[in-house]
Amino acid sequence: MTAVHSLPADVQAQVSAAEWQTRVDLAACYRLVALHGWDDLIFTHISAKVPGTEDFLINPFGLMFHEITASSLVKVDASGKKLMDSPYEINPAGYTIHSAVHEVRHDVECVLHTHTAAGIAVSCQKQGLLPLSQQSLFVLSSLSYHAYEGVALNHEEKARLQADLGASNFLILPNHGLLTCGGSIADTFLMMFTLQRACEVQVMAQSGGAELIHIPGQILAGARDMIAGVMRSKTGMGGQLAWPALLRKLDQQNPGYRQ
């Protein structure tokens, strides 16, 4: 087995400044997912487009999320071919899912997929995510579902995933997990934080056995424009506000992602 320290140390010298910054932010995102307890050993994946190209970065299959660094991320082209030397391969199911999104969603920089207990629990419910919390209000304005087809190794599934995702930023994969995609790594992380919290609240509320209060439909409909502003950095809000604070927390608890 290849040790983490055997990864090439000169990656920064081989890539553009823009790609290196994307690598740093994506490595931070992996470690933040681990810090929040959303990781699933070496499984699941987060990807980010290499600026100005159709290539994307994804995790080396075999590293835990809390270990990932800017240099260890694997760069692949649209066909999944590695573009730089790495002792690691990528998760083939990860390629299927992430390439499907990046192929058609040119507004998306980052795709984040998780297998959390609360996320899977909600994904198993026929009614899906319910309008129970303020967090669910944010999600329901841009939510789609993609039915489970088994482990995502069949590339023919890509077209169906693309059709189901459409223009949404949130995707629930029944019997499987959660996915968010956004115009920046920061926004995509914030979206997953919101979706994950909405699922946690739903599972906890249901466990109490009491009759639940649903957010009225007119509030859901009227909140769409406001939600778009809060969730996206291009409006001056969204992830760009929270990201520096998240990095400060990460620097205190698990630094090293910039290597």
UniProtKB/Swiss-Prot annotation:
Gene Ontology BP terms: monosaccharide metabolic process
User: What keyword terms does UniProt attach to this protein?
Assistant: Metal-binding, Zinc
Against InterPro entries, the record matches this protein to: Aldolase-II_Adducin_sf (IPR051017), Aldolase_II/adducin_N (IPR001303), Aldolase_II/adducin_N_sf (IPR036409)
Amino-acid positions noted as binding Zn(2+) in the UniProt annotation, renumbered to this chain: 113, 115, 176
Q: Which cofactor does it need?
A: Zn(2+)
Comment on bound cofactor: Binds 1 zinc ion per subunit.
Can you name a GO cellular component term? cytoskeleton
Query: Which domain of life does this protein belong to?
Result: Bacteria
Question: What GO molecular function annotations does the UniProt record carry, in alphabetical order?
Answer: actin filament binding; metal ion binding
State the family it belongs to: Belongs to the aldolase class II family.
| Protein name from the UniProt record | Putative aldolase class 2 protein PA3430
Source taxonomy = Bacteria, Pseudomonadati, Pseudomonadota, Gammaproteobacteria, Pseudomonadales
